[in-house]
């Protein structure tokens, strides 16, 4: 009995630790929305005044938006659509398109790519608006500090991005406790004000929201573009599911995050009922004056943590796109010996910081930035619902009636929010769309370019089986040792092999043709790692399989080979690779400008030797000229 109690107690402690960690990563963005969401719903250009009716209507919209979008759609439905525990829009697209014919599969993966592009557009806006809205609390403390808001915001973000290469393994342990304190403060400030003015609780009645939508449809439609700010960051619940698990994310939401957010929004509404002038900054004005500065510090820490979650999420999404073949190889550094998900991509880091600095200098304030916020978020939400409908039909075997009953209303909500945000396009909504469009162009160009290169390489090469038969019938001069030839195709001879024979006229006594393939599953077991084929005396073919969440490793490949009695020692093996020198031409395939972009990306991509961590002194690289 005592042992069972101890086991149960240990399990409870472990679950609480994971839930606390999830607070620091998953809910950072969503948890900092109270800094600006309600304030922006009454922004002057929307035409809505903080009258009692207006306040009750907006708070009612906030309540039901959170309940429908977060609690029902994401927490109860979307989190069920996992792929071996992993989530995220690319994962959802992969799950929806699995075992489909080529054309529908390509369409669903394109939806996933659009979602990735929108996520990247959102990733530029989120750190900017979050930290800026927190530091703007200085103006509440004293207006004289207003000129320091932008410099302090930029300094905080430069320090944050500059420290990324150290990783978050150490300081990350503080994220959970800080966010726990943050949500506790949100709840306490809101609850105190609700007690002072409990009339705000009437906003739970959906009739306030519905009456507002029906009686003032024009203003209500435009206002929805600001209301959606209360659910920005919701996609992180799904994207980070692989790190913390569905249970911890659901537990954190139901037990702490949802109550704290609702209490704070209702508290801000109660404050506005009592003092409409507090619309200037209802979040900070919830607190007594003596608490303003400590609250500013805590809010800044919370927004830094929210920004870190977005940065880490961007690294993860970009790595996934690289492995799936939608982006060129680039340097991926692991910042933790224990957590495979903690990575650092230098190029992504500095591009993201550059975009954020430009955005902050351009828009100057969180209110101006709010106009740019929303389109990317709602677009991603709508795409998630579309892909979820496919998963519900194909994987969960839902009937059309059930999908129409549950998913269609959710899609209507998403599309309505997206349409409302398009009204902000000229005021700044174009910015995340521009970033998303650039990301989509880059990803589709790289994917198409690699397909063209592979077609041309296969066309210019020889069939592998015929080549091996010919080498055995007419063997060239053999030298001792093992040679590994990296190949993009399992059907043809690698060009590095053909060039080696042409120029050196020798063949190693043991030749391994190695092809690395990324599967549309997040993780593969060790038993699924390789397919080993003995092609004939001295010739082997190894096809190594990795999931799109894994990092291809030569060491692991050769460990799997050893299990199949093919022992390879890295230090005694020569690796032969072909390097394509690409030339843009007028041949059919891609537009000339896309060919130019692809050639530039190919030239600046990380070499296979560096990506696969092959010792440089064991590599022979042979060039091949290809016309696109």
Curated annotation (Swiss-Prot):
Keyword annotations: Cell inner membrane, Cell membrane, Ion transport, Membrane, Potassium, Potassium transport, Symport, Transmembrane, Transmembrane helix, Transport
Subcellular location(s) of the protein: Cell inner membrane
Swiss-Prot/TrEMBL catalytic activity: K(+)(in) + H(+)(in) = K(+)(out) + H(+)(out)
InterPro entries xref list: K+_transporter (IPR003855), K_trans_C (IPR053952), K_trans_N (IPR053951), Kup (IPR023051)
Keyword Transport: yes
Keyword Cell inner membrane tagged: yes
UniProt GO cellular component terms: plasma membrane
Membrane topology: Multi-pass membrane protein
Pfam families listed in its UniProt record: K_trans, K_trans_C
TM segment ranges: 18-38, 58-78, 106-126, 141-161, 175-195, 219-239, 253-273, 285-305, 343-363, 371-391, 401-421, 425-445
GO molecular function terms listed in the Swiss-Prot or TrEMBL record: potassium ion transmembrane transporter activity; symporter activity
Family according to the record: Belongs to the HAK/KUP transporter (TC 2.A.72) family.
HAMAP family, per database record: Kup
Function: Transport of potassium into the cell. Likely operates as a K(+):H(+) symporter.
Protein name: Probable potassium transport system protein Kup 1
Organism: Aeromonas hydrophila subsp. hydrophila (strain ATCC 7966 / DSM 30187 / BCRC 13018 / CCUG 14551 / JCM 1027 / KCTC 2358 / NCIMB 9240 / NCTC 8049)
Originating gene: kup1
């Amino acid at each position: 009995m005592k042992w069972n109690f101890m086991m149960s107690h240990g399990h409870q402690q472990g679950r609480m630790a994971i839930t606390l960690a999830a607070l620091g990563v998953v809910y950072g963005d969503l948890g900092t929305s109270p800094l600006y969401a309600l304030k922006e719903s009454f922004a002057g250009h929307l035409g809505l005044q903080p009258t009692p009716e207006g306040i009750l209507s907006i708070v009612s919209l906030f309540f039901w938006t959170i309940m429908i979008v977060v609690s029902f759609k994401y927490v109860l439905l979307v989190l069920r659509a996992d792929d071996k525990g992993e989530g995220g829009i690319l994962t959802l697209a992969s799950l929806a398109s699995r075992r489909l014919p080529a054309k529908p599969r390509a369409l669903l993966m394109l939806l996933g790519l659009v979602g990735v592009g929108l996520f990247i557009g959102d990733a530029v806006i989120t750190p900017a608006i979050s930290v800026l809205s927190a530091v703007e609390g200085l103006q509440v403390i004293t207006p004289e500090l207003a000129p320091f808001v932008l410099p302090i915001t930029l300094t905080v973000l430069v320090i944050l991005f500059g420290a990324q290469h150290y990783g978050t393994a150490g300081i990350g342990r503080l994220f959970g406790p800080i966010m726990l304190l943050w949500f506790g403060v949100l709840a306490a400030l809101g609850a105190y004000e609700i007690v002072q003015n409990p009339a705000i609780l009437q906003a739970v009645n959906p009739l306030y929201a519905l009456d507002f939508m029906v009686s003032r449809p024009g203003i209500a439609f435009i206002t929805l573009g600001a209301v959606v700010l209360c659910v920005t960051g919701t996609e992180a619940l799904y994207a980070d599911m692989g790190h913390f698990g569905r249970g911890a994310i659901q537990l954190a939401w139901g037990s702490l995050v949802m109550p704290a957010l609702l209490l704070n929004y209702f508290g801000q509404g109660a404050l506005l009922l009592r003092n409409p002038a507090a619309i200037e900054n209802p979040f900070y004005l919830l607190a007594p004056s003596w608490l303003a500065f400590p609250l500013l510090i805590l809010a800044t820490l919370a927004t830094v943590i929210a920004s870190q979650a977005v940065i880490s999420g961007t690294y993860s999404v970009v790595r996934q796109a690289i492995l799936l073949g939608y982006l060129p190889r680039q340097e991926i550094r692991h910042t933790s010996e224990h957590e495979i998900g903690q990575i650092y991509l230098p190029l992504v880091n500095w591009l993201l910081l550059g975009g954020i600095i430009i955005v902050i200098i351009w828009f100057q304030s969180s209110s101006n930035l709010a106009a740019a916020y929303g389109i990317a978020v709602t677009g991603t939400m709508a795409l998630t619902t579309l892909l979820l409908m496919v998963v519900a039909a194909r994987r969960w075997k839902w009937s059309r009636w059930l999908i129409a009953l549950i998913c269609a209303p959710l899609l209507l909500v998403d599309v309505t929010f997206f349409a409302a945000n398009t009204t902000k396009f000229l005021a700044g909504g174009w910015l995340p769309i521009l970033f998303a469009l650039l990301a989509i162009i880059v990803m589709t160009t790289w994917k198409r370019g690699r397909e063209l290169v592979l077609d041309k390489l296969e066309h210019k090469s020889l069939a592998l089986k015929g080549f091996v038969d010919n080498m055995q019938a007419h063997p060239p001069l053999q030298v001792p040792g093992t040679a590994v030839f990296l190949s993009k195709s399992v059907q043809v001879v690698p060009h590095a092999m053909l060039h080696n024979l042409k120029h050196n006229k020798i063949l190693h006594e043991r030749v391994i043709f190695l092809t690395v393939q990324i599967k549309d599953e997040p993780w593969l077991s060790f038993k699924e790692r390789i397919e080993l084929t003995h092609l004939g005396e001295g010739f082997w073919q190894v096809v190594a399989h990795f999931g799109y969440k894994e990092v291809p490793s030569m060491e692991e490949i050769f460990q799997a080979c050893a299990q199949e009695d093919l022992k390879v020692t890295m230090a005694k093996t020569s690796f032969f690779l072909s390097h394509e020198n690409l030339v843009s031409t007028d041949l059919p395939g891609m537009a000339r400008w896309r060919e130019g972009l692809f050639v530039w990306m190919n030239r600046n991509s990380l070499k296979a030797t560096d990506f696969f961590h092959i010792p440089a002194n064991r590599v022979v690289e042979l060039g091949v000229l290809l016309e696109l």
